[in-house]
Amino acid sequence: QCKGRPVPQLEDVTEKAGIRFRHIANPLSTYIVESMSGGVILWDYDRDGWLDIYFTNAPTIEMALRKESARGALYHNNHNGTFSDATDKSGLATPCFAMGGAVADYNNDGWPDLYLTCLGGNILFRNNGDGTFTDVTAKADVADGRMSVGAAFGDYDRDGFVDLMVANYVDFQLDHLPPFGGKSLCKYRGIDVYCGPRGLRGAGDSLFHNNGDSTFTDVSKAAGVDDPHGYFGLGVVWADFNNTGWPDIYVANDTLPNFLYRNDGKGKFTEIGLESGTALSETGSEQASMGVALGDYLHNGRPSIYVTNFSDDYSDLYRNDGNWMFSDVSYASGVALPSFPLVKWGDAFVDLDNDGWLDLVAVSGHVYPQMEKVPASAGYAQPKLLHLNQKDGTFCDAGNLAGPALEEKRVSRGLAVGD
């Protein structure tokens, strides 16, 4: 634990801020897709200098079979600590079976646009600059159509237009639903739970090249990032990991090795996850890889990688040592043990105490509601994690020292940080 240093105090101001959004969830989590949604995005969609909020939402499978949708929510920042619901005006109310999303100005008109990852077809919303958005998915040709979870924009060919990388999870069809429980891969600690991802077919990933005319071309296979074996992709980030001037790609895969794609500067990527030390744990184990964040926590000019994982496993901190080499310093840095009992999801590097050094925060929540019946488990709702940077390559655990907001147990998925 952190001792002899001030710890930032975090307060839950949701009610004071006027945020009334509630995420829909099946209390039984009968299918794997019902445990996945819950993304959140901080972005200044109207360019007034204040961060606004978008929450993704998804229906239960029972609702989806009845063609019912779930209402997402856009909250406009009022500049006084409160927010106003701008969902109806914006046109972002009920877009899809939404998981997460990404923001970028894809058409270089100066306004940030919104891309949502969904089950059965993603959506690209063009920002019209007047508080409204237009669905341009068909024109842009970026629907994908599989179960997408993670997405990120990056200009891999440095032509001045952002491209789009999408991580896809499992092949999940509403007209061919997997059973609940029964099989060995559909049990956890002897209890029947939903099936997956093991036992289900994975889905490949997509890289869409921005053509500069508001359309995209799928170059996944040509670029070497299509994941032909169909791993269970969850998160994706872009970064110039070796300071070559070209953005590389990291994909976090559930229960399978992660990918690190090195950009060769000629439109192609080489997968070097195993060689770089970022594919597996320190002991060579495949992990759940449920959240991924980047940050130069050492001030060495190189982005390191933080990956959150399932319970009874630790979160990985891959220290970037340069020359495409990373070291798993999770235990040495102090971030491993506090994370072990929790099912970790969204994570971020953020300087919470304004000391100039990046700290680590992560949210947690089990995927199986049935865990409430297991006395030895951490339960379904779980607390958050906070690791403060000690400026020497290590972190101290401040999760239970930063106020009740972090200690309060919730079933969390997405995380976004901002002022």
Question: PLM ranges: what are they?
Answer:
Residues 1-419:
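Acidic, glycine/proline-rich Ca2+-coordinating loop motifs
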